[in-house]
A protein has these predicted regions:
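Cysteine-cluster motifs in flexible loop/terminal segments that predominantly coordinate metals
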Residues: 18-25, 72-75, 292-300
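Cofactor-cradling patches in redox/metallo enzymes
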Residues: 82, 143-231, 256-370
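Short functional micro-motifs and their immediate structural scaffolds
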Residues: 23-29, 33-36, 77-84, 260, ...
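Long terminal accessory regions outside catalytic cores
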Residues: 1-37, 50, 54
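Acyltransferase donor/substrate-recognition loop-hinge adjacent to the catalytic core
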Residues: 237-248
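Hydrophobic alpha-helical positions that pack around
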Residues: 251
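Iron-sulfur-cluster electron-transfer modules
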Residues: 8, 12, 39, 45-208, ...
Length: 370
């Protein structure tokens, strides 16, 4: 535990460098919903400057204000002063926890350590797929495994249809999400995943979750993994899909896949192969609005998170008139499906899920024609 907040040169410079221009207000999904200044990056930088200068005390209110951020990185990309507010927020969250301001994610950290997933589920899924040696190993992540099971089943089915020689493991949470909310990644869980993955003899790890992808690529806990890491869109982009969808299709860029990982083109390459009526929303690629699920925000403020997703759905429908919304992130998928209302006449899938359904439809049509 630390005794006081740390104001090193990097953090001090970031806080002072904020010019208070307010550009971040136009791209912050939480401010867009609440209109409260403290919820955008400028508001947080002003708050932290007051604390740094001793004008405001370190308090529970400061800790709670720091949780009102999805770490979507939109403010960072739109900051003319070159400040990275979401990185400041994440590092400040750790310091606040270190000072004893445990937030509601303390319980999640304990659950992850005890059960190996963020939901406290006691039983692991049996997906009915082989576990053993293979060139590729598929890693699903907590949200897909425990909250979007049907999407995962379709992804597995798609890989089987494409004759991919892959295996699966008894995975546990990568635990990277704990880093976002002020706690530390569980090294023992990382080691368990590494051991299980290396047993397969695989040369490539394919992950369906952009956040897991980032953890495997970026976090020192996984430096000994020794595999080529690919998000599933990177893996699938060169396949020749023999299916088409005639409905108007659009795509939402997940923050973790897009702004954080820089993966924009691969999902679109896949979509354009199967969807001739593909149309982009107005705010897309690095300018896409967040769905409200990231940075622990859905866990801390679930009602507001769903409202943000609902706002994003309305934007997309108004911009595109699409009949099908695709993404490739289990958290985005889960939040959008929870937010969808009757007025949203929109099918929502992960790309892999749609592809599997298209193949299933083609097989059905062939049977009917026979």
């Amino acid at each position: 535990m630390i005794n006081t907040l740390q104001w090193d040169e990097k953090r001090r410079k970031a806080i002072i460098q904020c010019s208070r221009c307010g550009f971040c207000r136009a791209v912050c999904p939480i401010f867009d919903l609440t209109k409260r200044p403290i919820t955008n990056a400028r508001g947080k930088m002003i708050l932290l400057k007051e604390v740094m200068e001793g004008k405001l005390p370190v308090s529970e209110a400061v800790a709670q204000a720091l949780l009102r951020c999805t770490t979507c990185m939109n403010c960072t990309l739109n900051c003319p002063s070159g400040v990275d507010p979401q990185e400041v927020v994440k590092s400040m969250r750790k310091d606040m926890v270190g000072l004893g301001y445990d937030n509601l994610f303390k319980a999640m950290a304990e659950v992850v350590e005890k059960y190996g997933n963020i939901y406290g589920e006691e039983k692991q899924h049996d997906w009915g797929h082989k576990k053993g040696k293979a060139p590729y190993v598929l890693f699903l992540g907590c949200v897909g495994t425990y909250r979007e099971e049907e999407s995962v089943k379709e992804t597995i089915r798609l890989l089987d249809l494409l004759n991919v020689d892959f295996t699966m493991i008894d995975e546990v949470c990568c635990s990277g999400v704990l880093e976002d909310v002020g706690y530390k990644i569980k090294a023992e869980l990382a080691q368990q995943n590494i051991r299980e993955i290396q047993k397969t003899g695989a040369k490539t790890l394919i992950t369906t979750c952009p956040y897991c992808y980032r953890v495997f690529i970026e976090h020192p806990a996984y430096k000994d993994l020794g595999l080529d890491i690919k998000h599933i869109t990177q893996f699938l982009k060169d396949f020749d899909f023999q299916v088409k969808i005639e409905k108007k299709v659009t795509y939402h860029d997940p923050c973790d896949l897009g702004r954080h990982a820089g993966i924009y083109d691969e999902p679109r390459e896949i979509i354009r192969k199967v969807a001739p009526k593909f149309v982009e929303p107005r705010r897309t690629r690095e300018n896409a609005m967040c769905c409200g699920a990231g940075g622990g925000f859905r866990g801390a403020y679930p009602k507001e998170s769903v409202k943000i997703a609902r706002n994003r759905l309305s934007q997309i429908i108004e911009d595109t008139g699409a009949e099908v919304l695709l993404t490739e992130c289990p958290s985005c998928l889960h939040n959008f499906r929870n937010a969808r209302q009757r007025k949203h006449h929109l099918e929502i899938y992960n790309i892999t899920e749609l592809l599997a359904r298209l193949y299933e439809g083609r097989a059905t049509n062939k049977k009917e024609a026979a």
